[in-house]
Every structure is written in structure tokens, then in C-alpha cells.
Regions:
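Helix-loop-beta hinge of the Bergerat
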Residues: 6
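C-terminal engagement/docking regions of AAA+ P-loop ATPases
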Residues: 1, 10-95
């Protein structure tokens, strides 16, 4: 759900001509899973998603003319999207 919300924000962002596609969202899901595995977990936490988002999203975004004129970068847009999209809050599991 968090990844889908991030992708949706990119699709409606005023400085983007083209946001993240469903395939881009799936790529973020896969890389977040890989990061979780590398960290020794069999589950993804929001930090996995936020840490991988720039690597997965930045080259997939198409900036608008206004964004390019004002020297925005895809990385800056990804950071903005992450800042304005509330990550899910994890609750502790109870036995």
C-alpha cells in the first residue's frame, strides 16, 4: 500500500510529466525485499522502501519543462514525494 501511494503521488505531481508506472512500483517492491533480506529479515519495513526509492524511481521519472527550467532533479522530486507521503506505522506483534 505504501509503495502504491508513493507511485500515485508521482503520477499527480505538478513537476512531473510522467510518474512511476506499475512496473516501477513492482521494481521498488522487489528491491525493498532484497534490502530486507540483506539486513537479515524476511519482511520489509518502511525504511527498506525509503532507502531504495531514489535508486528505483529517479531514472524512471520524466520531469516537466517547468521542473527542468527551475533545475529540479529527479532525486529532489523523489525526496519530496517521500517527505509528503506518510509511511505506515509498524505495530509490535503479540504472541
Amino acid at each position: 500500500d505504501y509503495i502504491a501511494r508513493l507511485a500515485e503521488v508521482t503520477r499527480t505531481h505538478p513537476l512531473l510529466k510522467l510518474g512511476i508506472s506499475p512496473r516501477g512500483a513492482l521494481a521498488l517492491c522487489r528491491t525493498a525485499k532484497a534490502r530486507a533480506f540483506a539486513e537479515g529479515r524476511d519482511f520489509v519495513v518502511p525504511e527498506d522502501v525509503t532507502q531504495m526509492a531514489e535508486y528505483v524511481f529517479a531514472h524512471r521519472l520524466m520531469l516537466s519543462s517547468k521542473a527542468r527550467l527551475n533545475e529540479y532533479t529527479p532525486e529532489a522530486i523523489v525526496a519530496e514525494v517521500l517527505a509528503q507521503t506518510q509511511p505506515p506505522v509498524l505495530s509490535e506483534r503479540r504472541a
